[in-house]
Regions:
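Mid-domain alpha/beta scaffold segments of enzyme catalytic cores
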Residues: 1-255
Length: 255
């Protein structure tokens, strides 16, 4: 099994223990994600220490204030590291106001350019205020205009109304623990519609622990619970979904 999106540096417990617990649960590859200068460096360092860990580097939209050419150059430099396999997470977050929409747009556009130059996938964060779709709609428009052939991962997929649009574009949809919540049946139904070669699973740890662990701090080992729910709604065995997401991650991240 794989975890396509985690934040090891933010999880409770030691890094070695988290990686060992994941391996014991059958999780043998994970992508740990940077969000700012400090967590980018930590993600790369974790990837250097562990064979099973790979990194993504970028600037989260909530951290987009102050994004400039120097920040972009630093991300591009880290992006060339042999264990960095994606740029991000980046995108738009209109739920919080830690950075203005224009600051987020500048950072997003710059990171699409970096991903294009490096030939790396881009990890997309999207969050809207309840009942709105302006962020995800603008993300689609921006990627359509700028991303070209860059592989796109819609992390913590939360736009079931756009699952068909994502499939048409060949983008990857990665499902997190919130897809297991009783109130999120629309996400499970969306997971059933994603093409076999474009589905991924993730934890987004330490956030969004799947239902059996809800209320606890999430960790990569718990991705198996999300995978079980996704397998069930897709009408396949856990083992078949495991083979599918492992193959998809291998094709995407080259690990």
């Amino acid at each position: 099994m794989i975890d396509s999106h985690t934040h090891l540096v933010l999880c409770d417990g030691g890094e070695d223990e988290l990686v060992a617990a994941a391996a014991a649960a059958g999780v043998h590859r994970m992508l740990t994600i940077g969000m700012d200068q400090e967590t980018n460096a930590a993600a790369v360092a974790a990837a250097e220490r562990h064979e099973s860990v790979f990194a993504a580097v970028g600037r989260h939209p909530n951290e987009a204030s102050g994004f400039d050419d120097a920040v972009a150059a630093e991300i591009a430099e880290l992006g060339a590291h042999e264990k960095v396999r994606a740029i991000g997470e980046t995108g738009l977050d209109f739920y919080r106001d830690y950075a203005t929409p224009d600051e987020q747009r500048r950072a997003f556009a710059a990171q699409i350019e970096i991903a294009t130059e490096l030939g790396l996938p881009i990890v997309i964060h999207s969050r809207d205020p309840e009942g709105e779709t302006s962020a995800i709609d603008e993300i689609f428009e921006t990627l359509d205009a700028r991303a070209g052939e860059v592989p796109v991962i819609l992390h913590c997929f939360s736009a079931p109304q756009r699952v068909g649009d994502a499939a048409e574009r060949g983008w990857y949809c990665s499902f997190a623990g919130n897809a297991t919540y009783p109130s999120a049946k629309d996400l499970l139904f969306a997971a059933a519609k994603v093409p076999e070669d474009r589905i991924l699973v993730e934890t987004d740890a330490p956030y969004l622990a799947p239902q059996p662990y809800r209320g606890k701090r999430n960790q990569p080992a718990y991705v198996v619970e999300t995978a079980r729910e996704i397998a069930a709604v897709r009408g396949v065995s856990y083992e078949e979904l495991e083979r599918t997401v492992e193959a998809n991650a291998q094709a995407l991240f080259g690990w």
